Amino acid sequence: MDLLSIQDPSFLKNMSIDELEKLSDEIRQFLITSLSASGGHIGPNLGVVELTVALHKEFNSPKDKFLWDVGHQSYVHKLLTGRGKEFATLRQYKGLCGFPKRSESEHDVWETGHSSTSLSGAMGMAAARDIKGTDEYIIPIIGDGALTGGMALEALNHIGDEKKDMIVILNDNEMSIAPNVGAIHSMLGRLRTAGKYQWVKDELEYLFKKIPAVGGKLAATAERVKDSLKYMLVSGMFFEELGFTYLGPVDGHSYHELIENLQYAKKTKGPVLLHVITKKGKGYKPAETDTIGTWHGTGPYKINTGDFVKPKAAAPSWSGLVSGTVQRMAREDGRIVAITPAMPVGSKLEGFAKEFPDRMFDVGIAEQHAATMAAAMAMQGMKPFLAIYSTFLQRAYDQVVHDICRQNANVFIGIDRAGLVGADGETHQGVFDIAFMRHIPNMVLMMPKDENEGQHMVHTALSYDEGPIAMRFPRGNGLGVKMDEQLKTIPIGTWEVLRPGNDAVILTFGTTIEMAIEAAEELQKEGLSVRVVNARFIKPIDEKMMKSILKEGLPILTIEEAVLEGGFGSSILEFAHDQGEYHTPIDRMGIPDRFIEHGSVTALLEEIGLTKQQVANRIRLLMPPKTHKGIGS
C-alpha cells in the first residue's frame, strides 16, 4: 500500500484482519526507514502500530476524540490521518511536529508533550459532551509510565466518581523512557498474569440466569459475586475499585483481541479501562531488546546495525559532566544523594546509581513528590541533588516554593536542558525557569559559561549550606575546554569580566556568552570597545559590579536564552531603577512572548534574533551617534 497517499483513516473500515496485519508490517518498515534519517521516538511508535490501527478502524476520528498522553507515540496516528508525505520533515524547523498539534490536523484534538494530562483532558471533554448532548466517544491513550503521574491518578479518581462514558486505553509496555518504578507498576505486573477476569465474570452471570427457579435470585446477587471475583481472580483490582469496568489484559499486537475488546468497550456504560500489553520497539530488534530506554527517542541511525549516526563529541555532555561531578563528590561525602523523576538515563545518573544504589532515588513521573522528598532529606542532614529538566521543573513549582525555598532547605537543583532544546519543540523548551525561579526568596540561581566553570558550580552548590541553590545547564555537549583537576568554590553572587571595554557593556551567561564575545570583536573593528561580563549568578546579581557599571553610565545590553518577561534582563532594569539610575540606556535580548516551535537550535535562534549579528546591531542602536565610528563616519 502507498502509505504516503493516505488521506484519512476511513479506508480501514473494510479491511480484513489479514490485510490489517500486512498494513502493520508496512507501517513498521516505513517508520524504521523514515526515522533512520530524521530521528524521533521510534520505540514508542513501533509498539503501538496495531493499537493505533485498531482504534482508527473501530472509531470515527475526528468526531471521536483520541487523546494521546505524552504524545510521542502519535506517529502512526499522524500517518493514518494523511500526514505521511510530511514525515521527511519530522521534528525539523517548520516541519511535522513530533507531538499532536491542533493546528496540524483536525484529528489532533488534544496537544501533549508532558505526561499524565490525557485523563484530565478526557474528563473535560466528556463533561462538555454530556452538557451539549452529543454522542462522541472519548478515548484517552495513556502509558503505564504516565499512569504513575499524580495528575493521572487524580483524574482516575474523578472519572470513576462521575461515571462518565469514556474508554481509557492503558498502553502497558513496562517502560516509559526508562524502566518504570513504583507500586502501581508492580500492580500492573500482577494484572498482566491474572487472566481475563471480565470474561469469567460475564460467563458466570450468564450461567446464573440459566438455572431454573433460583436463577433470578442468583442473578440478583451478581454484583456481590462480581466483587468476590475481583479479589479471587485479579489481585489488587485497583481500577474496578475506582469505578471503572476493567477489560484485559489483552495482546496489543493481536487484531482479534483488540477489535473484540474495543467493540465490547463501546457497548459498556460508564468509564472503561482496556489494559493493552504492547512491546516497545516491536519489529526492530535493536529497539525491541532495549531495556534501559536508549531507543525511546533517537537521532539518525543505521538500519542494518542499529548504530547511531552522530559526530564524535569532542567534549562530554552537560548532563554527564554534572552527574559525574556529583558522583565524584559523593565519594567523599556520604550525605550526597541523587533524585530523579523518571529520567536516570537522560540525566546520566546510571553511574551514580551503580556506585551508590542506596543513595539513588528514581521516583517515577512524580516531579512534585521528588521536590518535596528532596526538601525532607535536606532537613535530615542529607545533601540532595535533584536532577530535573527545565520543562519538567514547571510541574514542581509549588513544591519548590512551599517545601524547598520556604523552609530554606539545602537542596541542589540541577536544571537540565535549560534554554532552547530544538526538535522536541514548544512543550520542551527550557525557557521559563529563570522567570519563575528568580522571584522565590532564598533561591540562588546560576549558569556556567563552560564545562570547567560548570564543575566548579556543582562543587559550589554541594558545598553551600545556606539554603536552596540551582544550576541551569543546556542540552548537548560542552565546548571542550581544559578542565581543572581541583574543584573550587565560586563566591555566591559574583560575576567576572571576560572582555574589557569602555563604550558599552554586555551582561550575559551560559550559551549566549560566545555570541556576545564574537559580536564585541566585530564591533571592535568599528572602533567600539564593548565589555563582556559573565553574569553567571542570575540571582543574586553582583550588586557591587552593577553599581560600578551604572556609575560609569555605559549603555547595557542583557542577553539570555530564556523568556524576557520576568527574566534576567528584567532584574537588571529593576536594580537600575532601585538605584535611581533612570538615564542609563538598557536594552534586553531573549525569548519573545510566545511559545517557540520545534526545529534546530540554530534555526530557532536565527528566527528570534539571538545571533551575533543582531547583538552587534543592538549595541550600535544603544550608542550615541558620536560614539559609533562605523557606517557614515
Curated annotation (Swiss-Prot):
GO biological process, one term: 1-deoxy-D-xylulose 5-phosphate biosynthetic process
Any single Pfam family the record assigns to this protein: DXP_synthase_N
Top-rank taxon: Bacteria
Pathway in which the depicted protein is active: Metabolic intermediate biosynthesis; 1-deoxy-D-xylulose 5-phosphate biosynthesis; 1-deoxy-D-xylulose 5-phosphate from D-glyceraldehyde 3-phosphate and pyruvate: step 1/1
EC number, UniProt record: 2.2.1.7
Database matches in InterPro entries: Dxylulose-5-P_synthase, THDP-binding, Transketo_C/PFOR_II, Transketolase-like_Pyr-bd, Transketolase_BS, Transketolase_C, Transketolase_CS
GO molecular function: 1-deoxy-D-xylulose-5-phosphate synthase activity; magnesium ion binding; thiamine pyrophosphate binding
Entry protein name: 1-deoxy-D-xylulose-5-phosphate synthase
Family: Belongs to the transketolase family. DXPS subfamily.
CDD domains the UniProt entry points to: TPP_DXS (cd02007), TPP_PYR_DXS_TK_like (cd07033)
Binding sites annotated in the UniProt record for Mg(2+): 144, 173
Cofactor: Mg(2+); thiamine diphosphate
GO CC, alphabetical: cytosol
SMART domains referenced in this protein's UniProt entry, alphabetically: Transket_pyr
